Amino acid sequence: MIQTNASGIIKRKEHARKGHERMKRRLISLVLVLMLVMTAGCGKKSTTKKLKTEDLDETTLQGMAKDITKEMSLKNKIGQLFMVSVYQLDEAESKNQTSVTSQMKKTLKKYPAGGVIMFAKNINTPDQTKKMTDELQDASYIPLFMAVDEEGGQVSRVASNPKMKMTVYPSAQEVGRTYNNKKIAQMGKTQGKELKELGFNMNLAPVADVLTNKNNTEIGDRSFGADSKKVADIITTLVKNMQKQQISATLKHFPGSGQTGGDTHRGSTETDQTINALRDTDFKPFKAGIKAKADAVMVSHLMLSNV
């Protein structure tokens, strides 16, 4: 499950606006409609100008988010809670779809999902990927989160394909061991820029887990290390630089899967850590990422038996 920040819907529209001109027109049109509604009956001539969310404070964004959601149907609101795979939009096809089908468009119209995640099997070439993200956005009345897992190392859905010609980064473990802050900042910037060019607006990364269990094979080298402060510093740098490229960063896997022994991709797993232990270690990178204004947090299938 992914938790977005309070003004996520506005920021999502802004990210989409910067990556797709058609999204800009939708956002501006909606804002203008709201402004017309609020000023209707005033009897005074007024002028308007285009709004940019980066120029607005959090209170204003919260207000805009409330106004926009008031205009949405219950069905649309429920749909925004879901992120689906490409395959789930057209299950008649194989899981290796690399183009948008008519059924996918029909599904998005009937079930207005909040986002779509693409995997390596959906990503073939830069032109094909950009065409696919564009067409999925076109098929959705409400701008989509277009998401992908691009952590670096073994979880690199885009860079793992040589045809994509995307910058290849080593595992988080290697980054934590050998990269300085300048190189980490460049990594966040480069990943964000290259994903944006392909039509994505959300990266399901970085991994904020602190690896305190050396036998943890699920996280393993996907963690930046066992030092919670060092991991927190890396997360802060990555989030800030990635989001400067209009790519939403996603902190994962809350409340922290670095101490577990099971694989939450195959079910749930359990930890006996206390709340104080979590606060002392696991929570620190997430707190740092949230302070850096990360747009989203991914919640793990983790049971906390002592909390």
Spell out what each predicted region is.
Residues 80, 112-114, 141-144, 200-201, ...:
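Short, well-ordered coil/turn segments that N-cap beta-strands
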Residues 234, 239-251, 277, 281-294:
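Phosphate/pyrophosphate-binding betaalpha-module
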Residues 87-91, 97, 107-231, 253, ...:
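Enzymes and membrane/adaptor proteins characterized by extended Gly/Ser/Thr/Asp/Glu-rich
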Residues 3-22:
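Short, Lys/Arg-enriched N-terminal segments with co-localized hydrophobic residues
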Residues 23-46:
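Sec-dependent N-terminal signal peptides of Gram-positive bacterial secreted proteins and lipoproteins
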Residues 44-71, 78-79, 94, 102:
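N-terminal, intrinsically disordered, polar/charged segments of Gram-positive cell-envelope systems
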Residues 62-69, 101-105, 126-133, 185-192, ...:
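Extracytoplasmic/secreted envelope proteins and their assembly/folding machinery
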